[in-house]
Amino acid sequence: ILRCLVGSEMCIRDRDKNNSEDKQKEFLGKLYANVSVLDSGARGSTTTFVENKKGDVLIAWENEALTSLASYPDEYEIVTPSVSILAQPSVAVVDDNVKVNKTEELASEYLSFLYSKQAQRIAADYGYRPTDEEVLNEYSGKFNLTIKLDTIADYGGWTQAYKIYFDDGGWFDEIYNN
């Protein structure tokens, strides 16, 4: 979510032609200064906000926000930024495991199914943004189709992004420790 916030701020700063690293860090520092609880993950943050009623604003992944809204329709409002980051959970067949368990064919079929239109619709029903454009358009009432979605490639890939933002002494440490 840190990358998403920087991405959003970068777009704002680009409009003013004042997109310096210091300005981005300043923005994030001000934001984090208002954080009353910093949970270790998305589910914990959602639980803290929605069920324990701690905090004024929850910055969450889209699926978490949609799930919360479905569970508490009259209590919350989703405010969607104009820019966010496309989060794509990794899936893989682990060769050693499927060989030992003799499940190679089943695992491969499951992996292939995940990208089918049927599976994309099931995922969309649970708040996960479909990657299939046709299916995404079927859910235009649920997902904001105008949002600009950056990818990790826009930030130099995972190795580069991790080094800059999350390594010891990176942006997160610098902002969090100040």
Region roles according to the model:
Residues 1-7, 12:
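Single conserved hydrophobic/aromatic residue that forms the stacking wall/gate
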Residues 3, 37-41, 83, 98-106, ...:
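Extracytoplasmic/periplasmic, Sec-exported soluble proteins
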Residues 6, 60, 115:
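A conserved hydrophobic position in a structured secondary element of the catalytic/binding core
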Residues 13-81:
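Ligand-binding pocket segment of bilobal, Venus flytrap-like solute-binding proteins
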Residues 14, 95-98:
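Short loop segments at secondary-structure junctions
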Residues 63-66, 84-86, 97-99:
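Solvent-exposed loop/turn segments at secondary-structure junctions
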Residues 87-91:
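Small-molecule pocket liners
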Residues 98-178:
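Extracellular/periplasmic juxtamembrane helices and adjacent flexible linkers that interface
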